[in-house]
A protein has these predicted regions:
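Short, Lys/Arg-rich, polar N-terminal cytosolic tail immediately upstream
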Residues: 1-19
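Hydrophobic cores of alpha-helical transmembrane segments in multi-pass inner/ER membrane proteins
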Residues: 2, 59-76, 128-144, 191-198
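Hydrophobic alpha-helical transmembrane segments of polytopic
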Residues: 26, 30-33, 61-64, 94-102, ...
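Alpha-helical transmembrane segments of multi-pass membrane proteins
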Residues: 31-45
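Intrinsically disordered, flexible peripheral segments
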Residues: 51, 55, 167, 181-190, ...
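Membrane-interface helix-loop-helix junctions at boundaries between adjacent transmembrane segments
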Residues: 52, 85-94, 108-161, 172-185
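Membrane helical hairpin/interfacial module
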Residues: 57-101
């Protein structure tokens, strides 16, 4: 049985309404898992735990990336089969773009850790990863908002909160760039090389 046959059987098995729900839930909860892993990683710096790339904190972050990537793949199936339109289609496309950015940034983050060792909160891989996080949360929000499924609509406040948290996380990290050494000095100890800009 070829991969194409398996893909066709899976895409025929799932109803579009179920897949749309899965895309939005995976995009939102994947974002929450990523933020949780990122905050946990920052806390581990405060505790001065040893740092290497495949820590449990990074595994948590990249579990979230896997969730949003799964949302992107499922969303791609819906778009290819032309089962979406309007705001729903726009939301799915945003999730796909966000998950692609996260995958590319995650690979770059792994390479960066291999080359430079510990990197800070502000690095050439972290901010694109966080931007992809915002896109996934935004796409999930748009999907939920445009959907008529009342069960799924119950997640709307949670999706708004997730989007706000994702924007806040990127905003905090970008404030380190604007504040430069003044902001970095008090938190340098906490985040080890938290203000390193690669």
């Amino acid at each position: 049985m070829s991969a194409v046959t398996i893909f066709q059987k899976l895409s025929q098995t799932f109803k579009p309404r179920l897949v749309i729900s899965l895309v939005s839930v995976l995009a939102i909860f994947g974002t929450v898992v990523m933020i949780s892993g990122g905050v946990w990683d920052a806390i581990s710096h405060a505790l001065r735990e040893p740092e290497f790339f495949w820590t449990i904190q990074h595994i948590t972050v990249y579990t979230g990336v896997a969730m949003t990537s799964s949302a992107g793949i499922l969303g791609s199936i819906l778009i290819i089969k032309k089962q979406t339109n309007g705001t729903l289609k726009k939301g799915i496309k945003i999730v796909i773009i966000g998950s692609a950015i996260q995958i590319i940034s995650g690979l770059g983050d792994s390479i960066s850790h291999d080359i430079f060792g510990i990197d800070g909160l502000v690095s050439w891989t972290h901010q694109p990863l966080e931007f992809g996080l915002i896109l996934s949360a935004l796409g999930g929000f748009l999907i939920i908002k445009s959907n008529n499924n009342q069960r799924l609509k119950k997640f709307l406040p949670f999706s708004i909160l997730t989007l706000i948290l994702a924007i806040s996380w990127l905003g905090f990290n970008l404030s380190l760039l604007v504040g430069g050494p003044i902001l970095c000095l008090p938190i340098y100890e906490m985040f080890s090389s938290g203000c390193a800009i690669l």
